[in-house]
């Protein structure tokens, strides 16, 4: 790392989770797009102690802007369909694992639409976990203006494109849980999240300039 001396001073810029640390930081590291979609969905469960120790599986689909701006034959409309990439080695896997403090199996996919991410996350719950426990875990977002959570919701990319929101919903069968999370990879997954961090540092409402 070319600037290793900064690593210990950098604060992780997931605005809903580290507002006080961000407000006081000299350096904020804005999360990646896939980690944002994944962590916003999973952190409430982890913090509430509802997850078994088994590995969480994350399958996430991103629009072609997730591959960057560089011209590439593989990302041209006639070539691109839906494909997995970065199997077992995507750079966002250690970021998710470090922040969640839980082992994950993450597989990203690139699809033929411009922008947005839909993450589908599969987890095993502790045997005594109730629906009220799940709903209660996500109450941590009750006062967060840029998080839209609804039990049994099926978030869709069309509802978050060009918006600064993350949409989250969950479904369960016994102790098997599926959580769905949708963001705009260029906004909540990048630019608008950076603005949230700037707002926190300036003492402004986190949604200032975004709603």
Q: For each predicted feature, which ranges?
A:
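PAPS/PAP-binding and catalytic site of the sulfotransferase fold
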Residues: 28, 133-137, 194
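C-terminal substrate-binding/catalytic lobe of Rossmann-fold NAD(P)-dependent oxidoreductases
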Residues: 55-59, 64-183
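Conserved active-site and cofactor/substrate-binding residues in soluble primary-metabolism enzymes
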Residues: 9, 33-40, 87-95, 133, ...
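C-terminal helical cap and adjacent loop that interface with cofactors, partners, or active-site loops
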Residues: 22, 158-211
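N-terminal Rossmann-like NAD(P) cofactor-binding subdomain of oxidoreductases
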Residues: 1-78, 82-85, 171-173, 208-210
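Short, well-ordered alpha-helices that flank and scaffold nucleotide-derived cofactor binding pockets
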Residues: 43-47, 98, 196, 200
